[in-house]
Amino acid sequence: MMSARSVSPKVLLDISYKPTLPNIMELQNNVIKLIQVEQQAYMQSGYQLQHQQQHLHSHQHHQQHHQQQHAQYAPLPSEYAAYGITELEDTDYNIPSNEVLSTSSNQSAQSTSLELNNNNTSSNTNSSGNNPSGFDGQASSGSSWNEHGKRARSSGDYDCQTGGSLVMQPEHKKLIHQQQQQQQQHQQQIYVDYLPTTVDEVASAQSCPGVQSTCTSPQSHFDFPDEELPEHKAQVFLPLYNNQQQQSQQLQQQQPHQQSHAQMHFQNAYRQSFEGYEPANSLNGSAYSSSDRDDMEYARHNALSSVSDLNGGVMSPACLADDGSAGSLLDGSDAGGKAFRKPRRRLKRKPSKTEETDEFSNQRVMANVRERQRTQSLNDAFKSLQQIIPTLPSDKLSKIQTLKLATRYIDFLCRMLSSSDISLLKALEAQGSPSAYGSASSLLSAAANGAEADLKCLRKANGAPIIPPEKLSYLFGVWRMEGDAQHQKA
């Protein structure tokens, strides 16, 4: 009957004291062979063999206890010969033989060799007469001993598959049970030592120094974001978490992880159901813009993060509904997604670029036409004004100079209509020819004398005076030059 095989021991080699590689490889091969034989012994051992060796004498137990003390040392060269190794270097690096292996697997491997020495079938019964008297109990059971106090090995020690199962005595059963407990304690100690110490554990250790705090939940102290871990992070932590739970049940007979395990299982189921869930209005259609999709993604991440956030082993209030079903959670997440959903906006139709350019070009053309018309009309007005105002042949007037000259001409006409300027006209008619510009000053001074009397006589005789334009232009030129001369003297 095949029994359940225990966890194979893990052997760690301490190679810090070994400077040469061949010795290390040779020692490693020996350890591997010992482990393989130990595994076969575990597989072939059964619980029905426990009742077959109860009739042995009490001095055999004392003899086996004496052999257990001798088995703590390294195997002898004769035992290496049983494995087929004929040459063994006796190199001494000042290291005890029991320190070759750095972990508890060394004792396990050596105790296995002790079990094989004591579990031999009746194949060497002929050599029982050569054994010392102290080993008669073992000789009666079919074992042979050499000169070093060790039993000589035969092919029956390693043929674990034929001839039934190995004969194991009750003392061997106790030794195997002790080895299993040592291995479990060693593995539990390694796992606990490498667990990180958190602030909560330190605080609980200070408040309760007699109670040793352990990390009951790998997710209660470490909150990883959704972007860094994959979707199946519950399956990632599950094997390690189950292993720790089994070991703690064997040592403490407690079940502290059932609540957190149920929460992780519910979280995984909710994540898978939410990933497969699609809202009523699909975001893949053209009815929504890119900003709407971003808002829905943000709402989905918030819903998932609220589920994955565990505060001291208690789920967030968003996940604690009345019935605790996934449907209520999905309804809440859908409502949160609708809250972030923006209403549709209908924008006015914008004209194309070609229409905008055509309209702009038409406006520019019309503005240019109006500007040209305004400039042309202004130029025509200045030309007509220059024709009306008496000018000299040497005048090259700008628009501003033309306007100033026009104001002076208007002032001259106002003075001509007064009483004093009428006498000037009479003096000009008396002279007959307007050839001398130098006598203009004398004429103006003479006109000042008796202007009023002359004006009255002229009005009575002829009525309103009629002055031809040529005479006005001549008089304006004389008056203009006289004004410029006075301005320069001043």
From Swiss-Prot:
It comes from the Eukaryota. Disruption phenotype: Embryos fail to form the ventral furrow at gastrulation and lack mesoderm and all internal organs. Residues 54-68, 339-351 have a biased composition (Basic residues). Its main location: nucleus. SUPFAM superfamilies: HLH, helix-loop-helix DNA-binding domain. PANTHER family: BASIC HELIX-LOOP-HELIX TRANSCRIPTION FACTOR, TWIST, PROTEIN TWIST. This is Protein twist.
